[in-house]
Regions:
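Short, charged amphipathic recognition helices of the HTH superfamily
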Residues: 53-54
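P-loop NTP-binding module
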Residues: 1-50, 60-83, 87-297
Length: 297
């Protein structure tokens, strides 16, 4: 997965992890029922004998698995992800289910580059529309997983599904969509309708809600601008999933309100001419294209 900014292709580099909680790995493993007090004593003795880390000694004694150690480390560093997780959460949410997957590492690279090149709270730049030229290029996948990796920084993150044509976030996160963005824009709900995601601290999802008969008109209302302004006050970052640019004007409207957009393309599928037209459409909507991402997943 590569992201191209207005200047160059983003290099691959790492991202910081949140600060540790101070809890010891042994205590976390015991709290989770992975080790007994007797097991912990055995591990400590082995640790002293070999000079290894606690987790390494526990694995060597076959008392825990690699996956259980990674889960404990994630809790120690306040790095939330799903192990068993809520029933029905899609496996597409790879950043939550498999946070050490190479694709997720690339998403963290993109997160880091966006933080360095785009994110600017003082200038009001904390809302990003995720769009593409055509359907099936991975907008919803990228939006959902970017939201997860931002929340893993320990900051409040909001994912809004503004794709009234084919909403998917309610299925990806398995959240109810009786109320959502359409409800808020029509005056039947508030931003507080956004649902916290169980197991992913700091992440909330505002699903599309009931599909309206007038998507573009609803997104053009001043209430959408007001909702985004309020969201920027309450959340560290706001990610918005949109319909494809090539089929509907909705994405231009959302990008205009967000002010910034990330364009998703798919390897071996998206044509250069379609990408160029999508960039023009976003520019015509007075949106800044912060980068173009090639989805290879």
């Amino acid at each position: 997965m590569l992201m191209k900014s207005n200047e160059n292709v983003v290099p691959l580099d790492g991202a910081r992890s949140p600060a540790a909680t101070g809890r010891q790995i042994g205590a976390i493993l015991m709290d989770e029922g992975k080790l007994t007090a007797s097991d912990a004593e055995q591990v400590l003795a082995r640790q002293r004998e070999l000079g290894w880390r606690f987790g390494e000694a526990a694995i060597e004694l076959n008392l825990i698995t690699d996956a259980e150690l990674r889960e404990a480390l994630a809790k120690q560093y306040e790095f939330p992800y799903l192990v068993s997780g809520p029933d029905g959460v899609s496996k597409e949410l790879i950043a939550a289910w498999d946070p050490f997957h190479p694709t997720v590492e690339e998403l963290r690279v993109i997160r880091t580059q966006l933080l360095m090149r785009w994110f600017n709270p003082e200038a009001g730049r904390r809302t990003l529309a995720i769009t593409s030229a055509s359907p099936r290029e991975g907008r919803s996948f990228i939006a959902a997983n970017l939201a997860v990796v931002y929340s893993q920084l320990g900051q409040r993150t909001l994912l809004i599904d503004a794709d009234f044509r084919a909403p998917r976030q309610q299925s990806i996160f398995n959240v109810p969509d009786r109320f959502g963005l359409s409800s808020a824009l029509s005056g039947r709900a508030e931003l507080s309708t956004a649902l916290p995601v169980s197991g992913l601290t700091g992440l909330s999802v505002l699903p599309a809600g009931p599909v309206p008969p007038n998507p573009l008109e609803l997104l053009s209302r001043a209430s959408f601008a007001a909702l985004l302004a309020k969201a920027q006050c309450e959340y560290y970052i706001v990610i918005i999933d949109t319909p494809p640019l090539g089929l509907y004007a909705d994405a231009q409207c959302v990008a205009f309100r967000a002010a910034d957009a990330l364009l998703v393309t798919r390897q071996h599928q998206t044509r250069l001419a379609d990408t160029e037209r999508a960039v023009r459409d976003l520019t015509d909507a007075s949106a800044r294209v912060v980068g173009t991402l090639m989805n290879t997943y």
